Curated annotation (Swiss-Prot):
Lineage: Eukaryota, Amoebozoa, Evosea, Eumycetozoa, Dictyostelia
Top-rank EC class of the record's enzyme: hydrolase
Positions annotated as active site in the UniProt record: 650 (phosphocysteine intermediate)
Similarity field: Belongs to the protein-tyrosine phosphatase family. Non-receptor class subfamily.
Primary location class: cytoplasm
Protein name as catalogued: Tyrosine-protein phosphatase 3
Domain Tyrosine-protein phosphatase: 422-715
Species for this entry: Dictyostelium discoideum (Social amoeba)
């Protein structure tokens, strides 16, 4: 199992590449390594079979093999350890000590460490990597030349000539080597596999030799795997698995077969991919030391030509190593029961004829399951390979470091410190949000929206919003009001300043300076500031474009009462007067009272709830309707001297609010210049840019920007003007048909009660416009609220009661008129005289009927015009035109009976002729006459005696009704007593 604590060192002169598996930036070294090389970390050989503890000290000899140890083959595996063992350093090596290492055998007296290590049980774990690759040496590092004779073995193949050139003490070794002809080896034909991992470096290696001991590898092991990791180079993926193929059995052949395996490396110049394992298999036929068929390690890729013996090659290599690296310190570590010979100067070997092998793809230390780690590149070489290995030192942690590369001589404390730093940085790579927080620590006041007003510093532009006492009044810390256009409140004694998150927005038509106020949804702590702004700016229309909660997130707080119970916000008292729903638009009439003020103000709240956050409404019809209603109520407020800006808010006050304001501005331009398209210059882009100069971030998303075009195109299409998408529209606005634009402004002050007739003069009778204006009729006539009682001003200092608003009354009373004041209050003492006058007039009519009814008609003074829909709300007899005249005649007769005292003004005229007016109601004047144009004069002989008659009575019944005049007079007296003054209650007509 490969540990996940892999790390690498980052340098300032590194080139970054991306790991193809994890997309993690990897540092690939571009530095040129120094001439001296280090081998601080060498691979560790761990047994994969714990029951076999015997190891063989394999020295590449020419002809003789000690078969005493070859009888117990062990399968060995190579791995590395995470624990860093202390390494033993020595400054110099002489030739005698080198010979001791070369001629080392487990049977000598100085090999106690080797014998002890043979008893160790090793973990069969897979490849483990650490910061320092440890070599457990089998020798006691004896520098005594006299002990060389005791450490000699029969496996040494050094010639006398070579030993004489090196050291005189090696004569003993040569003497022992001359006995190679003795047939001590019973298994002379046994195949020996020399499994030697080696790594080839460039001419300028960067690894320090850790030990020069020969490698002890069992001869008959099946497969050996070695992972090489180099941390001295600035690469992070110099990991390779060096696989040694099984033994190749050959009983009679004396040829040499060599199998090489390359390591998987990166593009680092330190660790080249030519490092191979050479498996030399050969046969020993009791030959002498001069045998040329012996397995000779000549280098990394040796040839099969006649080469010196193994001892000569090793001595030459060690001499060259000592001459070149004598100034460096060498570190030594213990390897359990094994030792390796590190050959680091292979390129300087004149006998090395290397054949390059293809490089494997990069393997990141973070992708342990990568197939590149376990890919093998096997080549068959004609020569035997070298028994030398070089391991790279592993660094700790897994991330880039900004520190410069360490010096060549590093201590373990520095490595531990670097390991901890790299571990922390790798954790930051796993969590990029942590790195982003750190990188943006000094940029917390940079906001996400585009700022089109080119200013140097945000602090200058949002100075008031960034003050400590005002910063908490912002719903979103990245949506702040511009300093130049923000709304400034009047400071009050309680300590509240002048700040509120709101900006003035100008229109694009004349007389539209500061026509809008774009603000955020009020917070619980800023509701009183919001109503203070409404009062100080004298606003009469509030447009809310958000819900209280959207997608599980709170977007706004309730700042107005939802029931008829009034609520207090600071120094203001809000009362919900009435509320009507129309096409997903809630229209609420609010009464705003202020402490110290006598009379309230009426504010209309338009709440549209079908606009999604950061999106666009499903259709443009509702937004067009909302725009018409806003302008209508704005003009109505102007008539009441509350012509303040239209307050528009959503949640943040920039996205939906900016979209609606842009639509309303362009619709106003179309309305103003609709009849003259040459002056109408509509540019959505310029409009949005102007909005963003006044408040930052207006129109947030692309969908909202496209929705503006959609709505304006629909308006232009209805107007008969080509749409904005038409190419000809860009040149000029050509009229397809001359259709006047609906006018939204009201030139004259509107009456107290609105009817559809009041808007016919200013708005064309289109379907959408009539539907949008019907809400005003609902607000004024067909209210869903019960009759409201008179509300007292809680802040009033006088005892004067505030009369209810005219919008709350469903019936209109007749205004006061002196001419009609007394007839509605008849005294009882005049009843007798009236009855006598009625009897006399009836007798005169029977004796002398009038010849012309129209000539003697009497007209009464006109009354103030009233709408018939209020006077006859409960009338249900207007089925057809034929019955309408009879109904009006009966109603007029009943009115005459109720107000019979009015007859003393008639100067005893008994002729009640037809007035000739139409039978559709009252046209400008209130006439107490019959409207039957086709009946005879006898139909109205007794106008005060028709109470007991049916609706379809004839002229023959009039004489019978005259007999009951006395009884009717008494009944009229009782009815006249029940009549009340119009000051108290309105007239009820049935």
């Amino acid at each position: 199992m490969i540990s996940s604590s892999m790390s690498y060192r980052h340098s300032t002169n590194s080139v970054y590449t991306l790991n193809p598996h994890l997309n993690i930036p990897i540092s690939t070294s571009t530095t040129i390594p120094p001439t001296s090389f280090y081998a601080n970390n060498t691979p560790e050989m761990i047994q994969s079979q714990s029951e076999n503890t015997n190891t063989n000290n394999i020295n590449n000899s020419s002809s003789n093999i000690n078969n005493n140890n070859n009888n117990t083959p062990d399968s060995m595996s190579m791995s590395t350890s995470l624990s860093s063992s202390p390494s033993v350093s020595f400054n110099h090596l002489d030739l005698n000590s080198i010979n001791n290492k070369i001629n080392n055998n487990t049977t000598t007296n100085n090999n106690n460490n080797n014998n002890n290590n043979n008893d160790d049980k090793f973990d069969t774990n897979a490849l483990k990597l650490s910061n320092t690759m440890i070599i457990k040496n089998n020798n006691n590092n004896n520098n005594n030349n006299n002990n060389n004779n005791n450490n000699n073995n029969n496996n040494n193949n050094n010639n006398n000539n070579n030993n004489n050139n090196n050291n005189n003490n090696n004569n003993n070794n040569n003497n022992n080597n001359n006995n190679n002809n003795n047939n001590n080896n019973n298994n002379s034909n046994s195949n020996i596999e020399i499994n030697v991992p080696s790594i080839q470096f460039d001419n300028e290696p960067a690894m320090e030799v850790d030990s020069v001991a020969p490698l002890n590898v069992p001869s008959n092991h099946t497969r050996t795997t070695l992972a090489m990791h180099n941390t001295k180079s600035l690469s992070t993926s110099n990991i390779g698995l060096l696989n040694i193929l099984p033994n190749q059995q050959s009983s009679s052949s004396s040829s040499l077969s060599s199998t090489t395996t390359t390591t998987t490396t990166t593009s680092s110049s330190l660790l080249m991919p030519q490092s191979l394992f050479n498996n030399s298999t050969y046969n020993n036929h009791h030959n002498n030391n001069n045998s040329s068929n012996a397995g000779i390690v000549g280098g990394l890729n040796g040839s099969t030509s006649s080469l010196p013996t193994q001892a000569q090659v090793q001595l030459q290599q060690m001499q060259q190593q000592m001459q070149q690296h004598q100034q460096h310190q060498y570190k030594k570590a213990n390897l359990s029961s094994l030792s390796t010979v590190v050959d680091n100067n292979l390129n300087n070997n004149p006998m090395n004829t290397s054949t390059s092998s293809p490089a494997q793809p990069n393997a990141s230390p973070f992708s342990f399951s990568s197939s590149s780690l376990f890919s093998n590149s096997s080549l068959s070489n004609s020569g035997s390979g070298s028994a030398s290995t070089t391991s790279t030192s592993t660094s700790s942690s897994n991330s880039m470091s900004s520190s410069p590369p360490p010096s060549l001589k590093t201590s373990f404390s520095q490595l531990d410190e670097d390991r901890e730093k790299m571990r922390l940085e790798f954790e930051m790579i796993k969590k990029p949000e942590m790195a982003s927080k750190k990188s943006h620590k000094h940029h917390q006041r940079h906001y996400s929206h585009n700022d089109l007003d080119n200013r140097k510093h945000d602090e200058e532009k949002f100075f008031s919003a960034l003050q400590p006492n005002n910063y908490g009044k912002n719903r979103y810390h990245d949506v702040l009001p511009n300093e130049s256009t923000r709304v400034r409140l009047t400071p009050i004694e309680s300590g509240d300043g002048d700040y509120i998150n709101a900006n003035y927005i100008n229109g694009e038509v004349p007389n539209s300076y500061r026509y809008y106020i774009a603000c955020q949804a009020p917070l619980p702590s800023t509701i009183k500031d919001f109503w203070r702004m409404v009062w100080e700016e004298r606003s009469s229309v509030i447009v809310c474009l958000t819900k209280l909660e959207e997608n599980g997130k709170k977007k706004a707080d309730v700042y107005y009462p939802e029931t008829s119970q009034a609520q207090e916000y600071g120094s203001f008292w809000i009362h919900l007067h009435k509320k009507v729903m129309f096409k997903d638009i809630g229209v609420s009439s609010l009464h705003l009272y202020k402490k110290g003020e006598e009379f309230p103000r009426e504010v209309v709240l338009l709440h549209y709830t079908q606009w999604p956050d950061c999106g666009a409404p499903p259709s443009s019809s509702h937004i067009r309707t909302l725009s018409v209603m806003v302008n209508t109520f704005k003009a109505r407020g102007s008539a009441k001297n509350t012509n303040g800006p239209v307050i528009v808010h959503c949640s943040a006050g920039i996205g939906r609010s900016g979209t609606f304001i842009s639509i309303n501005i362009n619709m106003a331009k179309i309305e103003r210049f609709g009849n003259d398209p040459s002056q109408m210059n509509i540019s959505i882009k310029d409009s949005v840019l102007e909005l963003r100069r006044q408040r930052r971030g207006m129109v947030q998303t692309l969908d909202q920007y496209i929705f503006i075009f959609k709505v304006i195109n629909d308006v232009l299409t209805d107007m008969g003007i080509r749409s904005l998408s038409s190419p000809s529209k860009r040149r000029s606005c050509e009229m397809i048909k001359s259709t006047p634009m609906p006018r939204l402004d009201i030139s004259i002050p509107p009456p107290l009660t609105f009817t559809p007739k009041d808007f016919q003069s200013s708005i064309s009778p289109s379907t959408d416009m009539i539907a949008s204006l019907s809400i005003i009729t609902q607000m004024t006539q067909t209210l869903k609220f019960p009759p409201q009682q008179q509300q007292d001003n809680p802040f009033s200092k006088s005892s004067i009661k505030i009369s209810p608003s005219p919008l709350n009354s469903t019936n209109i009373s007749i205004p006061k008129n002196q001419q009609f004041q007394h007839p509605f209050q008849i005294q009882p003492q005049l009843d007798l005289n009236l009855q006598q006058q009625q009897q006399q007039s009836s007798q005169q009519l029977n004796d002398n009927p009038p010849l012309n009814m129209s000539s003697n008609s009497i007209k009464f003074p006109p009354v103030t015009s009233l709408s018939s829909c209020h006077l006859f709300e409960d009338s249900k007899n207007n089925d057809n035109n034929n019955k309408q005249q009879q109904q009006q005649q009966q109603q007029q007769q009943k009115n005459n009976q109720q107000c019979s005292g009015f007859s003393h003004f008639l100067n005893n005229n008994n002729n009640n002729d037809n007035n000739g007016s139409s039978g559709g109601g009252f046209n400008g004047s209130f006439l107490f006459n019959s409207n039957n144009s086709g009946s005879s004069s006898t139909n109205s002989e007794c106008s005060n005696n028709n109470k007991n008659n049916n609706n379809n009575s004839n002229n023959n019944n009039n004489n019978n009704n005259n007999k009951n005049s006395d009884n009717n007079g008494t009944k009229d007296k009782d009815e006249n007593d029940s009549c009340e003054s119009p000051r108290v209650t309105p007239i009820k007509c049935f």
